[in-house]
Amino acid sequence: MKNIVRTFFAAALLLSGLHVYAQPQAGDNQRLTPQVMARLFPAGVVSPEYNADGSVTFRCQAPQAQKVSLDCQMLPAETPMTKGENGVWSITVTPGKPDIYPYAFVVDGTKIADPNNMFIFPNEGFKYSLADVRGAEPSVQDIQNVPHGKVSYRFYHSETCGIDRVMTVYTPAGYDPAGSEKLPVLYLIHGMTDTYETWFKVGHMNNILDNLIAQGKAKRMIVVMPYANPYPEMIRQGKAQMYNAMDTDLVTKEILNEVKPFIEANYKVKTDAASRAVAGFSLGGRQALACGLGNPKDFKWVCAMAPAIFGNEYEANFQSGVYAPVGSLNKNLKLLWIGTGTSDFLIEASRSLDGYLTANGVKHTFYTPDGGHTWMNCRDYLARIVQLLFK
C-alpha cells in the first residue's frame, strides 16, 4: 500500500509540471521530512516583494537572457533590470502612491507575465501581472473587515450570438435568493480586450461594493459583468459575423435580450427601469452610452468611464436613433455621468460631449481627475458612481 501511495505521489508531481531536482535518499521515503520537501520543492524567486519602506522589488529568473526590462504603470517608461546571482534579474521601484499596478517583464524583446505572481490581469490581448501596493490605511478597493458579498460565474446560451456564454455576477452580503428582498441591478461592462473577469480581478469591484455598502455610502445592489466581446468565439464556430469592435448594436442586443432576462429570471431583482443602471469603461463606456441612452425605457442610470467615442460622432448617434433624442434625456434619465482622466487619450472627445450636452441643457456630471486610461482611474470611477446609484 505504501508503494502505491509513493507511486501515486510521484506521478502527481510529474503531471503537475513540478521539477524533481533530487531523488529521495535511503530512509527518507518513509515520510516527507523537511530535507525531502526542500529537494522536491526548492525555494523559488519571490516577486513582487513588498518592502517595509514602501518600495517594491520585482524579480525575473532568466539566466540565458541578454536583456530584461520592467514594463509597469508605476514607471513612465520601460526600465532595464539588473542581472544578479543564478540568472535572477531584479529592480526595486517606489510607486507614487498605493494602488494596483499592472506590470510585465520584457525578456529579450518578448513581453511575459511574472511567472512567480499568481495575480494576473485577465485580458484577451496582453498578459500582465498585478502588483497590489498597500498603504498605511486600507483603501476602498482593499479587503476590509466587513461583510463580504459573492462573485459567481454564470453560464448561459445566447440566441443573439448563437453561442454559449459566461458572465460574472456580484451579490452583496446577506443576499438571499429565497428571501423577499429585491435589489436594483448595475450592468457593468469592461473595456476592449478585457473580459468578464477584469472588473472583479483588476477592478476589485467586489471589495469596493462591500466596503461602501458596509459604510452606508452605497445602496445594496447586484452587479452583472457580461462578456462584451462575443466575436472570437463566434468566429471560431464559423458564424458569419464580421468583427467590428466599435459596433455597439450586438452588445446592446445581448444585454437586453439575453443577459437582462437571465438575471431577472434567476435573481431577486427589481425590474423597473429606475432600478437598472448601465456603466462601462473605454469600449464598455461606448457600449454603455449606446445601451443606456438608446433604451431609456430599460435604464435610468447611465455612466460612461473614459468612453471610446471619437470626434463628434455622438451627434450622429443622437440624430440617427442610436441614442434617444437629446431633448428627452432630462425627462428619461435619473443620472448621466461621464468621467475621463485629464491625461487620457480620450479626454478631448469627452470634453466635446460634455460641451454638447451642456449646450443642449442636459443635466449630467462630468468628472475629470488626474490620470490616464488606466484601471487605477477605473476603480475611482466605480467607487464614485455606486454612491450615486438608486438614490
Task: Walk through the language-model features, giving the residues of each.
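Short beta-strand segments of immunoglobulin-like
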Residues: V45-E49
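Non-catalytic cap/lid and distal C-terminal segments of serine-dependent acyl enzymes
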Residues: Q23-R39, Y50-S69, Q73-E78, K83-K391
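Bacterial Sec-dependent N-terminal signal peptides
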Residues: M1-A26
